[in-house]
Swiss-Prot record:
PANTHER family: 50S RIBOSOMAL PROTEIN L4, LARGE RIBOSOMAL SUBUNIT PROTEIN UL4M. Pfam families: Ribosomal_L4. This is Large ribosomal subunit protein uL4. GO terms for molecular function: rRNA binding; structural constituent of ribosome. Keywords: Ribonucleoprotein, Ribosomal protein, RNA-binding, rRNA-binding. InterPro entries: Ribosomal_uL4, Ribosomal_uL4-like, Ribosomal_uL4_dom_sf.
Amino acid sequence: MYQIPVLSPSGRRELAADLPAEINPHLLWEVVRWQLAKRRRGTASTKTRGEVAYSGRKIWPQKHTGRARHGDIGAPIFVGGGVVFGPKPRDYSYTLPKKVRKKGLAMAVADRAREGKLLLVEAFAGVNGKTKEFLAWAKEAGLDGSESVLLVTGNELVRRAARNLPWVVTLAPEGLNVYDIVRTERLVMDLDAWEVFQNRIGGEA
């Protein structure tokens, strides 16, 4: 059981959260690898010797020239020739069990909670879409830009106010994922986003 700090207009309080007690780094690595594989475009493509724009004519006779024997100029041995075993467009994605994905997400959030890097927010008071408003709020919340922050909220105005800052990554609650959690140093979520997260891991943590 973790005690998560909650920031509200009236002050700070704590919320008890049932998250995994043990963090499995390999499981987190598996989920991140799966995420990044899904993001790959897979459009790299090379031409084989049959696809390059050259004639298939033998460049000189097989014998009696004193030179090495060759076929057509599109052979891989020549500059500008085809490529042997080069990449072709492919899909790099693969399936990962849903239970593993849920556990990975729960563990990533638990890791931030264990480090004291998770902050829940009841309301972003005074933030109405302007970056300077978010900066003022962040200063009061103890976020000074020295650490990268993953901000998860369904409030479009808050996301708009924060997205311009190089040290903030903004996500909607449905977009919370292991990769963005582990690549940033702090995790800030509003209570609605926390509820969405709890529903996502529902009983599998």
